[in-house]
């Protein structure tokens, strides 16, 4: 059994129930002091694989090589996933195509990261106050041009952990799937 198939089925159920968190994940990396750090990102289904779009100016871009984890929780179906994965850079053609479909504000932010300040940089108080105005005034280049720092990652999971919460007297159900020599090995776990 491929746990990615189960993941997508559970996610589809959450979407059917209009769960606002169905497309979100917490993308977890390690900072320089080995502290875990997480940020909520949109988790995408890219041709049956997991992917995220991020900006190369983000600290996450450099931290990804130390390994990443994802966590999702969908309250509508009471299911949590923890996923460990390695990453591969998404095809730049896919980035170009997808980037053009983004709303204007995220596009402007990508250009802001490219031309003004990188993502996660500290702002002086005056800069913070004027950020919304500065973004509004930012003129986007020709639509065929995509910032060099716009990027994405294809996630290559090697471990899934699924927790199904259960009400009443039933214990929660917890399973782990580990990729071993190209095959998924299943383990039932104590919840």
Q: What are the roles of these predicted feature ranges?
A:
Residues 1-47, 51, 55, 62-64:
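An N-terminal domain-cap segment
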Residues 10, 72-74, 184:
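Tryptophan-centered motif/residue detector
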Residues 80-191:
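Charged, gly/pro-rich active-site loop segments
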Residues 18, 73-74, 112:
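A short, aromatic/hydrophobic, helix- or strand-capping loop or linear motif
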Residues 33, 58, 76-78, 91, ...:
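Residues that cap or initiate secondary-structure elements
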Residues 22-24, 48-50, 66-68, 149-152, ...:
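Short, surface-exposed beta-edge/turn micro-motifs
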Residues 44-82, 86:
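A short mixed-secondary-structure module that forms the rim of ligand-binding clefts
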Residues 28-32, 44, 71-75, 163-165:
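A generic structural motif
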């Amino acid at each position: 059994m491929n746990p990615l198939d189960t993941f997508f089925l559970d996610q589809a159920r959450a979407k059917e129930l209009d769960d606002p968190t169905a497309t979100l994940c917490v993308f977890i990396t390690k900072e320089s002091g080995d502290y875990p750090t997480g940020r909520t990102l949109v988790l995408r289904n890219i041709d049956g694989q997991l992917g995220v779009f991020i900006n190369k100016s983000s600290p996450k871009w450099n931290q990804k090589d130390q390994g990443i984890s994802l966590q999702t929780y969908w309250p509508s179906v009471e299911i949590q996933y923890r996923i460990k994965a390695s990453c591969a850079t998404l095809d730049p053609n896919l980035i170009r195509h997808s980037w053009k479909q983004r709303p204007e504000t995220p596009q402007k932010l990508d250009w802001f990261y490219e031309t003004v300040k990188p993502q996660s940089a500290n702002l002086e108080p005056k800069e913070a106050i004027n950020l919304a105005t500065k973004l509004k005034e930012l003129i986007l280049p020709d639509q065929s041009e995509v910032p060099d720092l716009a990027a994405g990652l294809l996630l290559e999971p090697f471990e899934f952990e699924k927790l199904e919460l259960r009400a009443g007297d039933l214990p929660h159900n917890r399973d782990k799937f580990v990729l071993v020599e190209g095959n998924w090995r299943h383990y039932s776990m104590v919840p």
